[in-house]
Amino acid sequence: HSQQRLLREEVLSLTRQNGEYDMGKKKSKSIVAVVGRPNVGKSTLFNALAGENIAIVKDTPGITRDRIYADVSWLDRNFTLIDTGGIEPESKDIILSQMREQAQIAIDTADVIIFLVDVKQGLQDADSKVADMLRRSRKPVVLAVNKVDDFKKYMPDVYEFYNLGIGEPYPISATNRLGLGEFLDEVIAHFGQEVEEEEEDDRIRVAIIGKPNVGKSSIINRLIGENRLIVSDIAGTTRDAVDTEITHNGKEYVLIDTAGLRRKNKIKEELERYMIIRTVSAVERADIAVLIIGAVEGVTEQDAKIAGIAHDRGKAVIIAVNKWDAIEKDNQTVKEYTQKIRQVLSFMPYAEIMFISAVSGQRLMKLYDVIDAVNENHSMRVATGVLNEIVTEAVALQQPPSDKGKRLRIYYTTQVAVKPPTFVIFVNDKELMHFSYLRYLENQIRDTFGFVGTPLKFFVRERKDKK
């Protein structure tokens, strides 16, 4: 037992150093949006800050993504960086209207806004107009003056940007990564205290996500409408995903709605970007994502993009096929739909699938039961002794891989976090842990404990053989 305890402590200290998870305590992550005219270097800054952490480049199979958001860490503060930029327009009028649009998205969804300007182009009329908007929003704004690759030469030009009236301009060069430290210090200074959610907060936070026009609002209205016990619209939520508190069967839920403004004249690409930003903003604050898919259109690549946001962030996922009443059905229909969904969303085989109708109310209240079950799985802890029995049995059933005569040895497995359940497997040589064997172990653990609706995270750590 003492050896097991030592191993466990070793595992925990190793993984804490890596900061790869937060021991199951849910921290609310700040959202930082970048706004600026075309060609001031937004993408360069985005790449400089995000480094290798670009969530969008992560190879979740079956998904192509645009570089719209990324996870960034600075001085142990984690935040989600959003690039509000869109298509590069031609005329000055279009530039201004697009910048206003970007600024509005940032004001709607972000906690802190980075306003990026270009020292070489100097202060432009469009900069002043957008600065006015940002000032009125009362959101914290950090002004970054880009392309200052020679501080002595450009400092007089940097001071000109004080005229925008949004505080001190921070000189940076995104290309050469100059001045980023002080600038990032200022960004995270606006986060306030990093709030660890109170352990006693038993409310289940559910984001309702999906493409436009799949019936998200109707579903939320139904869920609220059948529950006359609406506690309140939570005050103080400044982001544009609207949170509503609900009590159902004595349990409390927070529904986070991403159903945004319908903008008829918007270009398709812009609508999609806007939808993704709103989804990131909502999913960040939820435990569970309910992905709504339209039954008539069926599952699409765009659904996969939205699902990928929840998957990358380790959220539990329920897939709800809405407008089920509008479909001609026979006894194969459910099976065919399920197969198609599993095929397009192949990266989340764990997700629960259900078929509902907001119009008729069909199976809509059952959604609460599924949310409860999935929430339980997302928060499940497995005792270390039991977990190691399962892994030992799995190893006996299927020998671990070997390379050049050296075989993988698994010493010990322990669960170190929940939401999602996170495990550390301690081995002699992590290079020997083949992806397919890890998948096999995951399947054995799932077969035993269920874990329906939630992703599982695994870290493989080395511990040199003491023999």
Enumerate the language-model features and the residues they cover.
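Conserved nucleotide-binding/hydrolysis micro-motifs of P-loop NTPases
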Residues: 61-63, 86-88, 120-122, 147-152, ...
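Short, non-transmembrane amphipathic alpha-helical segments
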Residues: 341, 437-451
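Conserved C-terminal guanine-recognition region of P-loop GTPase G domains, centered on the G4
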Residues: 101-168, 277-350
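A short amphipathic beta-strand at an alpha->beta junction
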Residues: 450-465
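Long, well-ordered amphipathic alpha-helical subdomains in the mid-to-C-terminal portions
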Residues: 207, 368-433, 439
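Conserved G1/Walker A P-loop phosphate-binding module
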Residues: 21-96, 192-276, 280-281
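Canonical P-loop GTPase G-domain recognition
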Residues: 140-142, 149-199, 326-382
